[in-house]
Amino acid sequence: MQLETSYLGTVKYKQEDIIVFQGGLPGFPEETEFILLPFNEQPPFYILQSVRTKEIGFVCINPFLFWPDYEVELADSVVRQLSAESEQDVAIFVFLTIQQPFSKSTANLRAPIAVHAKKRFAKQLMLDGERYSLKAPIHTAGKGGR
């Protein structure tokens, strides 16, 4: 199948590439199916692209590459909702807000995305407390960056 995207133009994908967010993402309840695409084939950056709407795509990263001490404890209910057997079945990503220059970009460490890589279910989480920032500067990554 082919998909038009704002960030990457036309991309090919398979049905089994689709990640399902039951109930959608906060603010986008109608958007339940996404694919995770490497951004210009340059990990660690990815695009979480809506299958339904070309204009809805989010830049995201694996936060552990930038903030090694980042911690996400998944509630048992979340593990079950993702049809996972344990937390080890789940990959974590965070959304970026890209700014110019790039050094002013930020990551939302308080609301990560949990993705069951094999079963392709996902959920956006909201971490309790003030430990992590909604706008953690990328330039502080690796320095605590909370």
UniProtKB/Swiss-Prot annotation:
It comes from the Bacteria. One of its GO terms (biological process) is regulation of translation. GO terms for cellular component: cytoplasm. Keywords: Bacterial flagellum biogenesis, Chaperone, Cytoplasm, Translation regulation. InterPro entries: Flagellar_assembly_factor_FliW, Flagellar_assmbl_FliW_dom_sf. It is found in: Cytoplasm. Its main location: cytoplasm. It holds the Pfam family FliW. Interacts with translational regulator CsrA and flagellin(s). Belongs to the FliW family. PANTHER family: FLAGELLAR ASSEMBLY FACTOR FLIW (PTHR39190:SF1). Acts as an anti-CsrA protein, binds CsrA and prevents it from repressing translation of its target genes, one of which is flagellin. Binds to flagellin and participates in the assembly of the flagellum. This is Flagellar assembly factor FliW. It comes from Shouchella clausii (strain KSM-K16) (Alkalihalobacillus clausii). The gene is fliW.
